[in-house]
Amino acid sequence: MTQPPQTSRATIFTRAAVIWLVLICGEILHGIARGIFLVPHVGEFRSNQIGVFTGSIIILIIALAFVRWIGASHPRDLLAIGFLWLILTLAFEILFGRFVMGASWERLAADYNIARGGLLPIGMLVLMLSPLIAAKIRRVA
């Protein structure tokens, strides 16, 4: 029985970057839906808290759908992909939030302050671990 050919690291990380674009599109749609359907009922702050958990589910579903296609099977590579997604997402959130939405630095930082109810660090942890979690569930790693 022959082993399938190994996917190159360049291919793995290119595919991971493509899937990050899918993740960001999913999160943008999630944010729009939250703003339309949830914010009017529970307010912005509570909506953001709920959104961390619903967004984490969306991220895990996308990771589950694409983890085989990405081609990484070693836990080190899967964690590196998660770290790539984390860095890209943080950069996107800061650049988009600050320069497109006009949010203050204090407003951006508030979502990361667990002591004041900001739960985004939990979502970022899920994002970073999602390739590894998905690979374990799919028995890729």
Language model regions located:
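Core segments of alpha-helical transmembrane spans in multipass integral membrane proteins
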Residues: G26-E27, N48-R68, L84-W85, I122-V126
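Individual transmembrane alpha-helices with interfacial aromatic-anchor signatures
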Residues: A109-V126
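Interfacial helix-loop-helix junctions of multi-pass membrane proteins
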Residues: I36-R46, L95-Y112
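Mid-chain, well-packed structural core segment of small domains
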Residues: A72-R107
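Short alpha-helical transmembrane interface motifs in multi-pass membrane proteins
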Residues: R15-I19, S47-N48, T89, L119
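Loop-to-helix transition at the N-terminal end of transmembrane alpha-helices
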Residues: F37-I57, L78
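N-terminal signal-anchor transmembrane alpha-helix
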Residues: Q6-V39
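Membrane-water interface at the C-terminal end of transmembrane alpha helices
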Residues: I122-A141
